[in-house]
């Protein structure tokens, strides 16, 4: 199944994060914080402005992004994988390089 977000929505696959502390302690899944980085896997057509124009999104498929800890509260399971759906304005930055 393929997910096509609408308007200014973005679909993100969370990055896998190490579940070890700096001291080498392995954290159980419930104690580890969810990663706030991911890869954009789908983008909508753009934000519809008040005058009816559509503004293209600043992110594109394949971008590595950083988002806040409470962003992307909409999780969707697609082909056994949990994906986040969030508005573009919930993305804080694009990781370059």
Curated annotation (Swiss-Prot):
* Protein's name according to its UniProt entry: Co-chaperonin GroES
What family does the database annotate? Belongs to the GroES chaperonin family.
Gene Ontology cellular-component terms listed: cytoplasm
What does the protein in this record do? Together with the chaperonin GroEL, plays an essential role in assisting protein folding. The GroEL-GroES system forms a nano-cage that allows encapsulation of the non-native substrate proteins and provides a physical environment optimized to promote and accelerate protein folding. GroES binds to the apical surface of the GroEL ring, thereby capping the opening of the GroEL channel.
Chief location: cytoplasm
Localization, UniProt: Cytoplasm
Q: What does the annotation say about its assembly with partners?
A: Heptamer of 7 subunits arranged in a ring. Interacts with the chaperonin GroEL.
Q: Name one GO molecular function term.
A: protein folding chaperone
Q: Which gene encodes it?
A: groES
Gene Ontology biological-process annotations: chaperone cofactor-dependent protein refolding
């Amino acid at each position: 199944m393929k997910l096509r977000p609408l308007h200014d929505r973005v679909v993100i696959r969370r990055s896998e994060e190490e579940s070890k502390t700096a001291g080498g302690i392995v954290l159980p899944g419930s104690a580890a914080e969810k990663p706030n980085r991911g890869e954009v896997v789908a983008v909508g057509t753009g934000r519809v402005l008040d005058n009816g124009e559509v503004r293209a999104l600043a992110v594109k498929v394949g971008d590595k992004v950083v988002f806040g800890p409470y962003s992307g509260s909409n999780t969707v399971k697609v082909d056994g994988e949990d994906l986040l759906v969030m508005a573009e304005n919930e993305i804080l930055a694009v990781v370059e390089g």
